């Protein structure tokens, strides 16, 4: 299956994406990862105000196939979480790159974004998987 990964996104090896929005960053799970999970039934996210460290678990996503941890693609503080996804996990499945976003983070270091894969690199990675 071919996926369309937005050019303005950057991706972590663990399939989370970031989209910079001024001094904040929106975080979500890539369409590829969501597709691999199948029907999503539960999402667990950190609280607003929590500090995240790049590479550490910040929550889980549960599907009919598996429970997977999600990892912070950058270090920062949670400013907002998507309550709609928590209430209705199908939102993540229906529109992972849009309304299915997970968190808004105030990054500690914006430079960490540049260390993530661009959409072309990520697309090649998942195509080879």
UniProtKB/Swiss-Prot annotation:
Gene3D superfamilies: 2.40.50.100
Membrane among keywords: no
Keywords: Lipoyl
Domain Lipoyl-binding: 24-106
GO cellular component: cytosol; glycine cleavage complex
Cofactor details (free text): Binds 1 lipoyl cofactor covalently.
Modified residues (N6-lipoyllysine): 65
Cofactor needs: (R)-lipoate
GO biological process, one term: glycine decarboxylation via glycine cleavage system
The keyword Ribonucleoprotein is assigned to this record: no
NCBIfam families for this protein: gcvH, PRK01202.1
The protein's assembly and partners: The glycine cleavage system is composed of four proteins: P, T, L and H.
Protein family (similarity comment): Belongs to the GcvH family.
Physiological role: The glycine cleavage system catalyzes the degradation of glycine. The H protein shuttles the methylamine group of glycine from the P protein to the T protein.
Name of the protein described by the UniProt record: Glycine cleavage system H protein
Annotated organism of origin: Synechococcus sp. (strain CC9311)
Gene: gcvH
């Amino acid at each position: 299956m071919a996926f369309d990964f937005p050019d303005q996104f950057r991706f972590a090896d663990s399939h989370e994406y970031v989209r910079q929005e001024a001094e904040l960053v929106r975080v979500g799970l890539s369409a590829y990862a969501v597709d691999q999970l199948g029907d999503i039934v539960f999402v667990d996210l950190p609280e607003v105000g929590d500090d995240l460290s790049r590479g550490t678990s910040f929550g889980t996503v549960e599907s009919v196939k598996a429970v997977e941890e999600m990892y912070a693609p950058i270090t920062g503080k949670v400013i907002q979480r998507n309550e709609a996804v928590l209430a209705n996990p199908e939102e993540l499945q229906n529109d992972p790159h849009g309304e299915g976003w997970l968190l808004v983070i105030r990054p500690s270091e914006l430079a960490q974004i540049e260390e993530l894969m661009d959409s072309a690199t990520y697309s090649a990675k998942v195509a080879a998987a």
